[in-house]
Amino acid sequence: MEVARSLPYTSGSLLSAARAALENGVAVSPSSGFHHAGYDRALGFCTFNGLMVTALALRAEHPKLRVGILDYDYHYGDGTDDILRRLELNWVTHCTAGQTYLYPDQATAFLDAIPAHVARMAGCDVVLYQAGADPHIDDPLGGFLTTAELAERDRRVFQHLHDHGIPVAWNLAGGYQQPLSKVVAIHRNTYRACKTIYDVPMTRVAP
């Protein structure tokens, strides 16, 4: 029961952010723990797949809407792929960097690939961006980007989404460094990048 009660504050928060992004162009949900949860299972700190809950709820509200999921957590979004495969959803464009980019010598290739990843979302009406902190090179469960490279990742994502005119709702995703202030600093850099590109007050949503 306690787990069920958390749903409005996690998946519901991302859905609210996505609705706000459709209206305002950009919004943030301070939530994490989504992309490993699959069609019929919880996994890897993820109880519900809020990315897919949000996508399906938006599609129910707007039957022709197309959703992009840009997953830049360090780990592969296996739960998201599981749901997409089982439901055979062809209106969701899913890009998960955790399938390909894992090592420090891939940092430049990853950053250079961001424009192409965003371009894949060009037909989408909204993008859900998982801005993971666990790709940081010092993260115990991740590690291939420096702090500066993570900041550049976010700048490029927001710049290219803005240039394409695609609304974006972003969330925090993984981050496991201790003390927690190290993870918070990475999330603050994501916020700064978004604020700089969009030059608008951020919409912080409640469930």
Pin down the residues of each PLM region.
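A general "terminal functional-core" signal
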Residues: 1-207
